[in-house]
């Protein structure tokens, strides 16, 4: 089976502007490999092709890409989901972030927004307790669907609000984590966390477009979490 690709290429050291480059790959009939497998084979032919990868199991979040116009992880996206008769598989870097080279983007702004929400437990500056903080099962269950994020940035880079205000809007990934700590029974800084999210941009630039839900490789729902944060802010200010 002959696979055809159109891949975004840009090397700032030698290129004046980005371009799309065509590749072909012969694949075994009946064998459905993942896109990352195909990219690795293409890189064997063209060592200049750059992309990120690590675990190859959908755990590390390193290989987020835009594939046929939709964000996702290359390592868990089968070629059969992308290949259409008579059409090329179009691969681009995650949108909305500066391109370092080819399919590698600068994640600095994404991580900066994530850092703003203080993604760790706070306890009023007290010394760590002598033993772990205990939780009831129902308290722990509230965190399901919130802690599993792998920071691949597929959600935030699919969000128009993040494209338009990347330095002000926290983004879906950061706000999902923010809600995870807001409702954690072991955290004592709910008010200060809400203070940090109370401006006009951090949370309320989310317009519930739900691109983030559509592309999340872990099946999480950042839009729902953001809605809960909005409710907490509005109730506090009522």
From Swiss-Prot:
Transmembrane segments: none annotated. [4Fe-4S] cluster binds at residues 149, 152, 155, 216. Its EC number is 1.3.5.1. SUPFAM superfamilies: 2Fe-2S ferredoxin-like, alpha-helical ferredoxin. GO terms for cellular component: membrane; plasma membrane. It comes from the Bacteria. Residues 8-97 form the 2Fe-2S ferredoxin-type domain. Its cofactor is [2Fe-2S] cluster; [3Fe-4S] cluster; [4Fe-4S] cluster. [2Fe-2S] cluster binds at residues 55, 60, 75. It is found in: Cell inner membrane. The keyword Zinc does not apply. [3Fe-4S] cluster binds at residues 159, 206, 212. It catalyses: a quinone + succinate = fumarate + a quinol. GO terms for molecular function: 2 iron, 2 sulfur cluster binding; 3 iron, 4 sulfur cluster binding; 4 iron, 4 sulfur cluster binding; electron transfer activity; iron-sulfur cluster binding; metal ion binding; succinate dehydrogenase (quinone) activity. InterPro entries: 2Fe-2S_ferredoxin-like_sf, 2Fe-2S_ferredoxin-type, 4Fe4S_Fe-S-bd, 4Fe4S_Fe_S_CS, Beta-grasp_dom_sf, Helical_ferredxn, SDH/FRD_Iron-Sulfur, Succ_DH/fum_Rdtase_Fe-S. The keyword Metal-binding applies. Binds 1 [2Fe-2S] cluster. Binds 1 [3Fe-4S] cluster. PANTHER family: SUCCINATE DEHYDROGENASE [UBIQUINONE] IRON-SULFUR SUBUNIT, MITOCHONDRIAL, SUCCINATE DEHYDROGENASE IRON-SULFUR PROTEIN. Two distinct, membrane-bound, FAD-containing enzymes are responsible for the catalysis of fumarate and succinate interconversion; the fumarate reductase is used in anaerobic growth, and the succinate dehydrogenase is used in aerobic growth. This is Succinate dehydrogenase iron-sulfur subunit. It comes from Escherichia coli (strain K12).
């Amino acid at each position: 089976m002959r696979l055809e690709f159109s891949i975004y290429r840009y090397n700032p050291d030698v290129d004046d502007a980005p371009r799309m480059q065509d590749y072909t790959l012969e694949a075994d009939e009946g064998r459905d490999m993942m896109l990352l497998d195909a990219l690795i084979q293409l890189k064997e032919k063209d060592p200049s092709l750059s992309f990120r990868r690590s675990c190859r199991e959908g755990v590390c979040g390193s290989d987020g890409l835009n594939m046929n116009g939709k964000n996702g992880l290359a390592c868990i996206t089968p070629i059969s989901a992308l290949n259409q008769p008579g059409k090329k598989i179009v691969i681009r870097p995650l949108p909305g972030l500066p391109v370092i080279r080819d399919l590698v983007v600068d994640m600095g702004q994404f991580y900066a927004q994530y850092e703003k929400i203080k993604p760790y437990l706070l306890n009023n500056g007290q010394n760590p307790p002598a033993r772990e903080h205990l939780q009831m099962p129902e308290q722990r269950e509230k965190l399901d669907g919130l802690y599993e994020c792998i920071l691949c940035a597929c959600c935030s880079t699919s969000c128009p609000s993040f494209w338009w205000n990347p330095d002000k809007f926290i983004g879906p990934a950061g706000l999902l984590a923010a809600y995870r700590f807001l409702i954690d029974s072991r955290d004592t800084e709910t008010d200060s966390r809400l203070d940090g999210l109370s401006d006009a941009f951090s949370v309320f630039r989310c317009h519930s477009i739900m691109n983030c839900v559509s592309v999340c490789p872990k099946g999480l729902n950042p839009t729902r979490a953001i809605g809960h944060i909005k409710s907490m802010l509005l109730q506090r200010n009522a």
